[in-house]
């Protein structure tokens, strides 16, 4: 079975083709550089760009796989969560292809797909497992009993970890997206230069707003506004703040894991999302947990359509009926069920 996946939940326009063995035959991702000057994604610009770019990435994916639309068995498209305009563009492209080529169409949950990206690239994952999604929009922990059953056990109470990296980057005067730049600066900084403390919140939830404010005050002074211009700071100070912040942000998540693993008798860890590409984060997780940890390859950490096609194909094969696609901007935490057909 061949599945063509479409991803447009935010500012990446992506198309991929995946077969029933989880082999990626094509994986095309077009990032939108137009948002950099705004310091973040502008929803209207993102949706307009998707309209322009989708035909190109779809054609490139088909060319890369040396296939035709007629060869596809299924069209999978991101339906939730994300920017409503961007989601709508992707869904309507998917519907158009499905109707025109007389193919089946299935909607996919973007957050579930990030977890599936780790599962997709792994071999012999042992269950039950702990699942972590660490991205620009979401930070959450899941108990995965088996590949078709899991439940939410903790999530951020405020900012997502990836969002926090970008906001701290703005404080430091770095361009968007700031995550890779902070990681690079941190390599030459001292992580103990600033006493940023990882947040401690009850249960298995996370919090990053206090850390974000602490970094703001370290750069601009107490009671500063996030919108006030960043002062001129030395490269050495940039490096030290980046390293100290990165340590605290990663520790905020890593410190929770041993307790979760013990409580739920987890035998492995699956991690997905853009922050999963950060090498310091990977090391912190592996150090905190004496378990097999499965990260996606770098090309599947950020938003991509291969994870959408893979999860869509898996769901289609395991379910006898396909629910109607429902576009939804917000993630519906109470109705998650990875690798299954969960409607928002």
Curated annotation (Swiss-Prot):
A Gene Ontology term for the protein's cellular component: cytoplasm
InterPro entries noted in UniProt: ATPase_NBD (IPR043129), Gcp-like_dom (IPR000905), KAE1/TsaD (IPR017861), TsaD (IPR022450)
CDD domains: ASKHA_NBD_TsaD_bac
Any GO BP annotation: tRNA threonylcarbamoyladenosine modification
GO molecular function: iron ion binding; N(6)-L-threonylcarbamoyladenine synthase activity
Pfam families: TsaD
EC number(s) reported in the record: 2.3.1.234
Binding site for Fe cation: 110, 114, 303
Chief localisation class: cytoplasm
Family: Belongs to the KAE1 / TsaD family.
Name of the protein in its database record: tRNA N6-adenosine threonylcarbamoyltransferase
Organism: Chlamydia pneumoniae
């Amino acid at each position: 079975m061949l599945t063509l996946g479409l991803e447009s939940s935010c500012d990446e326009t992506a198309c991929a083709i995946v077969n029933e063995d989880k082999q990626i035959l094509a994986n095309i991702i077009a990032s939108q550089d137009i948002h950099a000057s705004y310091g973040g994604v502008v929803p209207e610009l993102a949706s307009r760009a998707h309209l322009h770019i989708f035909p190109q990435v779809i054609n490139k994916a088909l060319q890369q796989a040396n296939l035709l639309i007629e060869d596809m068995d299924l069209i999978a498209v991101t339906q939730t969560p994300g920017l409503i305009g961007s989601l709508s563009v992707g869904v309507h492209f998917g519907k158009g292809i499905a109707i025109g080529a007389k193919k089946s169409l299935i909607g996919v949950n973007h957050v579930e797909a990030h977890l599936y990206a780790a599962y997709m690239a792994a071999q012999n994952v042992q269950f039950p497992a702990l699942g972590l999604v660490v991205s620009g929009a979401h930070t959450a922990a899941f108990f995965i009993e088996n590949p078709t059953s899991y439940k939410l056990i903790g999530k951020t109470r405020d900012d997502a970890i990836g969002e926090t990296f970008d906001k701290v980057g703005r404080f430091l005067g770095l361009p968007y997206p700031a995550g890779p730049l902070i990681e690079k600066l941190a390599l030459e900084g001292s992580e103990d230069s600033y006493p940023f403390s990882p947040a401690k919140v009850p249960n298995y939830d996370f919090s990053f707003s206090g850390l974000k404010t602490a970094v703001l005050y370290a750069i601009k002074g107490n009671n500063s506004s996030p919108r006030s211009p960043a002062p001129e700071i030395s490269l050495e100070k940039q490096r030290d703040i980046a390293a100290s912040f990165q340590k605290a942000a990663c520790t905020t998540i890593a410190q929770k894991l041993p307790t979760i693993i013990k409580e739920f008798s987890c035998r492995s860890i699956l991690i997905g999302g853009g922050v999963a590409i950060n090498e310091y984060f990977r090391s912190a997780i592996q150090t905190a947990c004496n378990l097999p940890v499965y990260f996606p390859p770098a090309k599947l950490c950020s938003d991509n359509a291969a994870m959408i096609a893979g999860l869509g194909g898996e769901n289609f094969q395991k379910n006898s009926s396909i629910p109607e696609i429902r576009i939804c901007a917000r993630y519906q935490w109470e109705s998650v069920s990875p690798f299954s057909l969960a409607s928002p």
